Amino acid sequence: MDGFAVVVGAGSFRVEGGVRFPHRWTAEGVSVGAEFTGAHLLHLAAAGCVLNDLYREAAGLGVRLDGVRVTASGGFDTESWASTGIAYGIELDSPASAEQQAALIEQVDRVAEIPRAIRAGAPVERR
């Protein structure tokens, strides 16, 4: 699943040359590296949600995050243009222990709203 790759970063992992957006969890904002296609935007939604939820859940657990980078990619069936899946990776810059970081990542994988919605599927209708 290496197609349609995107990257979002915050803190010490901001994306050089990426587009910057304000972010409620970091003063410097979030940077995004992605092309503007439907596939990239779908993957960006998942990656951006995971990044946000890492900061949200870390605050609740008392885990300091100095930087977060989330990458996501996936494929599409060229006959139906249905997603063939999305894979994402996480890098953390944190003084927290490896165990605390792993627990944070597991928690976010359970609660991140966009990945959960994609996993569950949802009807999309034109109005």
Q: Locations of the language-model features?
A:
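Extended beta-strand/beta-hairpin segments
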Residues: 1-45, 52-127
